Amino acid sequence: PENYIQRVIQFAKQGFKEIEFKTYDTDWDSEAYLTVSGQNSNNSIRVTNEFLEKVEKNEDWNLLRRTDGKVFKTLKAKDLWSKITEAAWSCADPGLQYDSTINEWHTCPKEEKINASNPCSEYMFIDDTACNLASLNLIKFSLGDKSFNVDAFEYACRLWTLTLEISVMMAQFPSKEIAQKSFDYRTLGLGYANIGGLLMSWGVPYDSNEGRSICASITAIMTGISYATSAEIAKELGAFSKYKINSKDMLRVIKNHKRAAEGFEDGYDSLTINPVPLIKEDCSITELPKAASLAWKKAYELGSKYGFRNAQTTVIAPTGTIGLVMDCDTTGIEPDFAMVKFKKLAGGGYFKIINQVVPQALKNLDYDINQINDIKQYVLGSGSLKNCQSVSHSALKDKGFEKEQLDLIENSLESAFDIKFVFNQFTLGEDFCKNILKISDTQLNDFSFDMLNFLGFTKEEIDAANIHVCGSMTLEGAPHLKD
């Protein structure tokens, strides 16, 4: 690391000839994790339209002191933008919030500006407010054959909007101010998870016009139905207490949403940058954009008549924790980050799982059951050296392995990341390694010692055995794949 290099240079200048550096391992309970700062924080920065315009023109941007508002430093906006994007690409921080756009879509601008969000950045509203979250697992509304149960999804959105509205009265907040303002604005946090899993199960690429259109349609249905339900509740119980002074702005925002759901590229009210509209032609499931348009038409009509019970109704949270409990393959709006996951168990050990929608996706892409099983084994591996052509049982017997050692190896392979981690003195026993395999103490205690290589297996043979046992961890290169 760069800081270590600088330390060495400084020590050398001071005349030090020997420097001792502390080393760490990667165990999740080790000291190494304690040295990594920022583990319990999410870092986001806000950029305005003015900043983005200066990036385009390669103009100067002033950094201001928070204490007195005076200029601290002036630099090129484009250079700062490059640093921000490189940092976000390499470590996912900082997150970006587009301040001008956020406040142009603010439903209650007469009160306060939206200054910040919650840590995960899905909830954008005024200071000292909060919302309760609820997420729907989208794959539960799939009918399995690239069709979506719109009626059931709309019903679930209505039901959960009502449930979250009730929860405003029951929620416990960390301060009096947050409790009061959350009661006044009654913001809700309905969202969804597993859009990546849903698209994959249908064989639709996540990064495609079709995938984006399906996602946009489902999102528009959820938010439109939720606002329409909020207006229905307002008819019975009244609008939220701050609605009257914000009604004109809120209806403007709802109308802009409606226009986007209807697919218009222009005609928006008080927006500097128009949204990307819903492109109906890209959506292969024709009832989705139709339902989205109707949902927002209903939301605007009912809201114009009765107002809204809630200042906001939906968010899309990362669902990193609840998504696992909900049996989701992917969290929030994200794609799947890997075909295979190793889940570490708190009691020790691991288990390996493949994304459970992969077989369904292959079926929808017209692969037969035998092809699907072959592809699954290629990805996950067999968890055994049986039928392996390179590091086989017979080859190991020729090296001195008996049934006892082969059984020990087999019992350890199922959860192994790499077969080399199984071939060690802790699995096979120190006596066997020394007396039968003739491995020295120095070699056994060397962390980099490769027993399979010592036994005479080539790199190609070891790699082939690894794929056979542990899998390739990816679909790339799998048998039977079509172009």
Model-derived regions, located:
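Long, C-terminal-biased catalytic regions of enzyme "large/alpha" subunits
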Residues: 1-483
